[in-house]
UniProtKB/Swiss-Prot annotation:
SUPFAM superfamilies associated with the record: Cullin repeat-like
GO biological processes: exocyst assembly; exocyst localization; exocytosis; Golgi to plasma membrane transport; protein transport; Rho protein signal transduction; vesicle docking involved in exocytosis
Keywords, ordered alphabetically: Cytoplasmic vesicle, Exocytosis, Protein transport, Transport
Name used for this protein in its record: Exocyst complex component EXO70
Principal location class: cytoplasm
More details: Present with 4280 molecules/cell in log phase SD medium.
Oligomeric and partner information: The exocyst complex is composed of SEC3, SEC5, SEC6, SEC8, SEC10, SEC15, EXO70 and EXO84. Interacts with RHO3.
Function: Involved in the secretory pathway as part of the exocyst complex which tethers secretory vesicles to the sites of exocytosis. Plays a role in the assembly of the exocyst.
Amino acid sequence: MPAEIDIDEADVLVLSQELQKTSKLTFEINKSLKKIAATSNQSSQLFTPILARNNVLTTLQRNIESTLNSVASVKDLANEASKYEIILQKGINQVGLKQYTQVVHKLDDMLEDIQSGQANREENSEFHGILTHLEQLIKRSEAQLRVYFISILNSIKPFDPQINITKKMPFPYYEDQQLGALSWILDYFHGNSEGSIIQDILVGERSKLILKCMAFLEPFAKEISTAKNAPYEKGSSGMNSYTEALLGFIANEKSLVDDLYSQYTESKPHVLSQILSPLISAYAKLFGANLKIVRSNLENFGFFSFELVESINDVKKSLRGKELQNYNLLQDCTQEVRQVTQSLFRDAIDRIIKKANSISTIPSNNGVTEATVDTMSRLRKFSEYKNGCLGAMDNITRENWLPSNYKEKEYTLQNEALNWEDHNVLLSCFISDCIDTLAVNLERKAQIALMPNQEPDVANPNSSKNKHKQRIGFFILMNLTLVEQIVEKSELNLMLAGEGHSRLERLKKRYISYMVSDWRDLTANLMDSVFIDSSGKKSKDKEQIKEKFRKFNEGFEDLVSKTKQYKLSDPSLKVTLKSEIISLVMPMYERFYSRYKDSFKNPRKHIKYTPDELTTVLNQLVR
């Protein structure tokens, strides 16, 4: 009997056989996959160069297309630029300024477009040539604009301002068309990098032209007088013409800047300042040179300093409100000339005192002294330079000129409130102080001459020490008569004004009081003494009354005789003197006469004059 087969073993055997088959099949599959992988790798190696070449060809195609487009763009730009260049080559005169600048603007726009597009391009070498050409073309064109600008500025040639001043002709100025062209070019450059250059050209050319013009006048402005020891003649210095020309150019340049910078008002002050600064520097240097000459010879050239005051004040006035870098130079000039003019005021007073002190005796005719003539000649000189004198009154006080031995009681200005800020008031005061100084010092010398053994007591009509009041009063009044005559016939009349004339009247009244002082003493003798007797009734000592009449008669005749010696030439002084004498004598005499005329049995023996007779004598006394 065959052996019995186990079922589980049979299953294992079958499964094992199947697994072997599967393993073999898997091996075969893996083998096939390796072959496929090897084949795929070989294919990939074959296709990679082909794809790379294809990519290169695609890029090359794009580059060729881009290059063709760039070449077309460059060609278009070059053609357009070439057209503009042809126009610009014709020049401004042929093309016209407006069209010329418009073409340059278009080139500038092209350049800006190219430059702004550069950031979006990776390659720009194809535009480099046209870019460089445009930049150079614009620079050449703008250079031509500057040359054209200069040619217009230089259309006005250097000229001698004195000719225009003499003929009262305005200084040369640009035509409206030229002003329009200059403004157009300034406007073109305004706001770009070349703006400051064109402005510098304007400033430089205008300053240079004006300095060349002023050079015609400079040699004459450096001389004050051809004769070193001759007094300066008013208006003869070339500095006056130099100043007038400078003022004309300042006005001209202001108009020019206004015309050219009408749209750019904020630039006007700076541009004008730059143009004028070299002129002001040259003026200040010349001013200083003139002042140095004045200081070296104040006796002859001193009054010229007042013309310099007018000059510097006029220049500063013309520059008022304008910014000037070297305005301090003018301030320095003002300060320096002020020191000179202040010394002239002080020296005038010192000169009067010195001249008066040089008098050794009173003139035999009690007439006008050399000191008076010199003083009035000097004051007339001051009056010829009235405007300069007024200008020199800045920052000056009365103390600047008053003498060191000044005594208020001797002067006719005492404790009066005046507006010292008013230059006219100051100048009037100076003239009056000069006249007062003359009178006071003439009186002092007269007292010393007539009363050498006593200290002078001047400006005092009531002085008991002064025994020669009438003569001294007449002496001073004679000199004041000349003073007043010269005042009335010169600019001094206006310069004195109301206050000055009042002071002169007070001065005359002082010395009229001197002349009537003896008359006052005479009438004082008529003051009667009253006695009371035992009955209580008033009585008079007849002898005393007789003595009073006798003394009056003698004194009256003596004074009449003396007064007749002093013949005044001024009609107003005659009237005043006669009025003063009559007002002093007649009231007292009439009172005394009416009271005591009946005291005597024979009145005519003691009473020589009736009031009417006395009045007649007095009326004939001063004629």
